[in-house]
Each structure stands twice: as structure tokens, then as C-alpha cells.
From Swiss-Prot:
Cleaved signal peptide residues: none
The name this protein goes by in its record: Glutamyl-tRNA(Gln) amidotransferase subunit A
A cellular component term, taken from the record's GO annotations: glutamyl-tRNA(Gln) amidotransferase complex
PANTHER family the UniProt entry points to: GLUTAMYL-TRNA(GLN) AMIDOTRANSFERASE SUBUNIT A (PTHR11895:SF151), TRANSAMIDASE (PTHR11895)
EC number: 6.3.5.7
Native source organism of the sequence: Prochlorococcus marinus (strain NATL1A)
Family that this chain belongs to: Belongs to the amidase family. GatA subfamily.
Amino acid sequence: MTFEDLRQKLKSGEVSSKELVQEKINRINELDPTLNSFLIVNTELALSKAEHIDKQIASGDHLPPLSGIPIAIKDNLCTKGIKTTCASKILDNFVPPYESTVTKKLLNAGAIMIGKTNMDEFAMGSSTETSAFGPTLNPWNITKVPGGSSGGSAASVAAGLCYGSLGSDTGGSIRQPASFCGVVGMKPTYGRVSRWGLIAFASSLDQVGPFANNVSDAAEILQVISGKDELDSTTVDIPVPNYLETLSKSIKGMKIGLIDNCFDHEGLATDVKESVLSSASLLENLGAEIVNISCPRFNDGIATYYVIAPSEASANLARYDGVKYGFRAEDEQSLIEMTSKSRALGFGSEVKRRILIGTYALSAGYVDAYYKKAQQVRTLIRRDFDDAFKKVDVLLAPTAPTTAFGSGDNIDNPMAMYLSDLLTIPANLAGLPAISLPCGFDKSDLPIGLQLIGNVFEEGKLLQVANQFEKAAEVYKNRPKTDFTL
């Protein structure tokens, strides 16, 4: 059921907003003790707002587009008066005194914030296993991970616990879990959506975006949260087009480039490769022209990312010292001891690992050899994309090299975990928009994600291609069983 379907049902009185919210709360109470996709459920607040919206509907008031629709929020987005932990012990009791720009826009659009979703601690991870509050499980198979770091947002949509959600994407943290959980997930162009109120991981890479069950719902959420924000100087003052208007347009004559480097990689699973290539053939049948494109430095993205992102993280996370807010170690004799112990006890092992990597890369003897060189390679990756978009409209690749891997399989193997973001990282380094949508299933009936990458601020074109594929393939209609038998 799309947002438009819900609007019609609410307007006609066939269903009330309170009923929509209560149904999702009941479902959360039934399924989430197993999945652990939510950290906080706003039961009373959500029902109260739903009742208010129902009264407005009964009075015939003109309502904003997402009125009465339950949406979940990743727990690294500040929500005024509602605890925001970033899935970390160090922020366990942090209650923001302000609202992030994107959540404020959603609330102004009438959306009902049903809860805050689980994630990898400080968005550092690819499996939602580094959360201080326990891992999230994949609703398609609870022995598998949902991906990360926005695993709770992806799993909650896939399991039908909400109609849409917000996540953040630094190196694939929306698209990879969207692929693993069989939902639509989109990372906008860097600067399209405000980061004000997003707890920072890597400021030059982080971007907020939507999860949804279908492309049109993702487009609606993106429409609401996009735009210039005076509180975030990295947002760009470019008019936001009407994304819904382009969804139904034909893709006949559009050039779509297959990124050769992705399909040649030895870590790419056969099922994934075959499904994505089959998806390219379907797009060709819809009138698109499929061409091969080489991005020579595409596979250099992962090494580049794991210098730049930890370097930025080491600076951003220096603010958590136990002094002004967050977890504070007790019984320490000096400020230095208190700060050291607060960070040692408050941060998890993956966060500490990345802080150490970043601190090392920025140290006096190594900043030129590592950080400066990584920034130079980042520029070359961006130039490869610039060259590619002179020849094609959209690029096509798998979202992830594999389908969802087993819980615990990679948690003690950082290199294996990092490689799961191999195909998503380059778009972040170049600041490009990219979307993942379900395109098939592997032999174990786990979802496979198709990734489309666009040129800067061409989200509309991406959504157009994605929507035409979705309507033709109809993979999105498959939903996970919810008895959660092993």
C-alpha cells in the first residue's frame, strides 16, 4: 500500500490515522522483541498525534502530504525531547533540546514519528551488530544480518513495522541494508538534504535519505526532506524538482552504463551478478540503451574511504568527553582520568578502532602519506564519474557483492565486514545520488539489490529509472514471512 493509497483511505474514512498507528504498534509489540529494530517506540505521542490528525480530517482541513502516516527515524537524528543514543552507551541518556531539520520537515509534513531505530554504534558498521543495545535481525531470515549501519530502519520497513523510515548513508549505510532487507533505499546528492541535527560520523560523506517499500513512497519522503537549510552551510540552494512528476515517464532512449569494474570483482556472488545483469536486460526491454562503462578507480574507493572516514570521525567524536553530556565515568581523580575512562567505557570496540585509524592517519608523520593521498584519489574517483556521465545518464551496479551474511560471521573480521560496502562507497566519495531497489532473490530466498547511481542533483532521473524497473519487475511485492522460524 503506497502513501497515496493511505491518503485516499484516510480521506474517505475507510481507516483512521489512529488505527494505522495502533496496527503498527501492535505489530512492533509482536515482532520486534525478536528483530530488535527499534530502540524507542513513541506509543503515547504517536497515538496522540494520530487522534489530532483524525480530528483535522473530520473537520475537512487541508492537510500536508504525509499526514497520519507512521514513519521511523534512525537514532542518530536528534529529536527534541526524545532520547537519541546513536546506539552508543556514551549517549545512553542524551535527550536533545532541539529537532533535526529533516525530522522537523517530516513532522511539518504531518508524518507520525512512531519510534527511533537501531543502528551500528555511531553509524560505524555494516551489519547493525555494533549497537550497544544488541543486534538487529533480518526479517527475511533471522539468522542473517539486516546490513548496516541503518539496519533497524531497513528491517522495520521490510517487516511492516512502519510505512517508511529515515537513515543515513556515509559509505552505503542506506543502500546496503536496503539490499539485504529487500526494500528501497536512497542516498541523495551531498548537499541536497540538511545534516543539521544528524550526529556526525564523517561530515564530508554523511547524507540523510529515505527507506520505503516502493519507489514512489521513497520519492515522497525525499521531496519533503530536501532543500536548502540555513543551519547547514553544506546544503545547496538549488530548486527541488517535483520527483513524483517524473516517475511515470518512459526511459526509452536513456543511456544506462554497466560499471565493468563491479562485475569483474572476484568477491561478487554469482546469484547477485546474474540477477543484476538480468535487471539490465529488463531495462533494455523498456527502451533504455545499455552500454559498458569503465570507472578505473572504482575499486580504490574502499581503501580511500577507510582513511578519510575514520579521520573525520576521530575529530567529530573528540567532543564526547564526559563533561557536558553523555556517559561520565565515576570516582576518577582528575579530568584526564575521567575523560579517558568515559571514552574507554562509553565507546564500543569498532568505534575505538576507527578513532585510532583516523588519529594515526592524521598524525604528523603520516598525514601526507595517508590522508592527503586519500583525498587525491577521491578527486580521481570523482573525475572517473564525471567522464562516465558524459556518455550515459545513469550508472548501474550491484548494491552489495553478496546477499545478507550470517549474524556473527564477520563481526570479528573487520576486513570482511568493510568489503561489504565495496560497491556503495564510491558514490559517497563523489557526493553522487544513488538508490538501491530489490531486483531478485538468491538460492536461499534472500533479497538482491540493484544499485543505480546518478549525476549530481539528478535524483529525479534515478527515481524515474527505478520506478519503471519496479513496475516491470514487481519484485517489491514479495514480503518476508513473519513467523521467524529458523
